[in-house]
């Protein structure tokens, strides 16, 4: 279902609307979309601000953490003024300034599997911007069950990666990826991360989400795209569905 754009919105989003093949239809699809952003750290801040600026109709912001001083190096929606606040409230304030037309739904909670699945079912797309292996796996299971597209990003040290899962027949899921590469529980706290790297990966997540929601372009589904910031090189690998995968396999 699409919704009509106001005159103000048509002017605001003009640079997207004039893109050949995107047009008013693509922008109206964005306005009608509901996106769940899980994690309002470096990746989530970058992705959410571009989704808001681009005109996604509703952003649900899910995180249970509060803003700390060490976050401010890379989490661009937060500031000194919001130290100690829940990240979802800090992000909501910043996003409302970016685009007042977007409906923002803060979810300051650590949801159990049932509650998380209910949120997934209520949205058109999920952005995995967490650094928590257990939550990543829960998102994958819920998205697979409801066939909700999942855009997953990760960044550590000077390397980032992005994967898109649409759960079509024969396509892999996030668990297939983690079975192949292992589940690295190392976080930025131990290993560090360069600030612009998370912005790069988060922006790519927003771009893939926009493509999926609007039907514009070719999403990076069924593969992993890896960015090496030390050499400014991208490489990609095609992913195969693991036949013994606990989530999507035939097991």
Locate each region found by the language model.
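Adenine nucleotide-associated cytosolic modules
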Residues: 1-251
């Amino acid at each position: 279902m699409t919704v009509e754009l106001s005159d103000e919105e048509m002017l605001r989003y003009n640079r997207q609307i004039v893109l050949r093949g995107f047009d008013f239809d693509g922008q109206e699809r964005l306005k009608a979309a509901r996106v769940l952003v899980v994690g309002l750290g470096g990746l989530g801040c970058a992705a959410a601000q571009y989704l808001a600026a681009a005109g996604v109709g509703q952003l649900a912001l899910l995180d249970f953490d509060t803003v700390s001083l060490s976050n401010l190096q890379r989490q661009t929606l937060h500031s000194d003024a919001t130290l100690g606040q829940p990240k979802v409230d800090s992000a909501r304030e910043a996003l409302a300034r970016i685009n007042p037309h977007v409906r923002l739904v803060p979810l300051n909670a650590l949801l159990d599997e049932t509650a998380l699945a209910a949120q997934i079912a209520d949205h058109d797309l999920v952005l995995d911007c967490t650094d928590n292996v257990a939550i990543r796996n829960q998102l994958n299971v819920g998205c697979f069950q409801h066939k909700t597209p999942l855009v997953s990003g990760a960044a550590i040290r000077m390397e980032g990666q992005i994967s898109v899962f649409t759960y079509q027949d024969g396509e892999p899921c996030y668990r297939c990826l983690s079975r192949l590469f292992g589940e690295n529980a190392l976080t930025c706290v131990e290993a560090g991360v360069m600030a612009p790297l998370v912005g790069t990966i988060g922006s790519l997540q927003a771009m893939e989400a926009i493509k999926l929601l609007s039907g514009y372009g070719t999403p990076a589904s069924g593969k992993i795209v890896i960015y090496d910031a030390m050499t400014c090189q991208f490489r990609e690998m095609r992913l195969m569905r693991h036949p013994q995968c606990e989530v999507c396999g035939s097991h």
